Amino acid sequence: MKYDTSELCDIYQEEVNVVEPMFSNFGGRTSFGGQIITVKCFEDNGLLYDLLEDNGHGRILLVDGGGSVRQALINAELAQLAVQNGWEGIVVYGAVRQVDQLAEFDLGIQAIAAIPAGCRDEGTGASDIRVNFGGVTFFSGDYLYADNTGIILSEEPLELDDNEEDEII
C-alpha cells in the first residue's frame, strides 16, 4: 500500500505527531507503514539481528541509534533478513551503509545519513522501551507512516480507504 503522509496529516491532524525532517529514504520502498517495535542501541547492531529474525508482517523496526553517524547500524545483510521475515520497514535515528544494495530491497528504510563504516554486533541495547528523537516520543505498539515527505506517528492505526487499489493514501 502507498501512503501519503501529507494527506494523512490533513485528515488526522489531531491524531498524529510529525517527526522533525531529518530522515532520507534508502530502501526500495518509498512509502511504508505499520506498527513499531522500538529498540535503543548505540553503534552496535547485534540486537537488531535478533529482532529482525522474528516475523515482521505489518511491523516496522524503529531504532534509536543516538543519532550517531560515525558507524552504520543498518547494512545489506540486515535488510535482507528483514525482507525474508516480512518486515514493512526500518527507521533508524543513525546511519546506514551499502546504500546501493539497500535500494534494491522491497523494504522501507529511512535514516539520517549513510557512511561506509560498520559497527560492532555485541548485542548491547534494549527493545520495547520508550525512545525519543525528532521531537516525538515513540512507544512499541504505536503506528508509523513514512514516505519521501516525512514520517508521522499515531497511537492507533489510521483508517485507510483501500477500496480503490490505485489510490494513494
Swiss-Prot record:
GO cellular component: cytosol
Domain of life: Bacteria
GO biological process, one term: negative regulation of RNA catabolic process
Alphabetized GO MF terms: endoribonuclease inhibitor activity; enzyme binding
Key word Iron present: no
Main location: cytoplasm
UniProt subcellular location: Cytoplasm
Gene3D superfamilies named in the record: Ribonuclease E inhibitor RraA/RraA-like
Keywords from the UniProt entry: Cytoplasm
The keyword Cytoplasm is annotated on this UniProt entry: yes
Subunit structure: Homotrimer. Binds to both RNA-binding sites in the C-terminal region of Rne and to RhlB.
Stated role: Globally modulates RNA abundance by binding to RNase E (Rne) and regulating its endonucleolytic activity. Can modulate Rne action in a substrate-dependent manner by altering the composition of the degradosome. Modulates RNA-binding and helicase activities of the degradosome.
Family assignment from sequence similarity: Belongs to the RraA family.
NCBIfam families on file: NOT-MenG (TIGR01935), PRK09372.1 (NF006875), RraA_entero (TIGR02998)
Record protein name field: Regulator of ribonuclease activity A
The organism's taxonomic lineage, starting at the top: Bacteria, Pseudomonadati, Pseudomonadota, Gammaproteobacteria, Enterobacterales
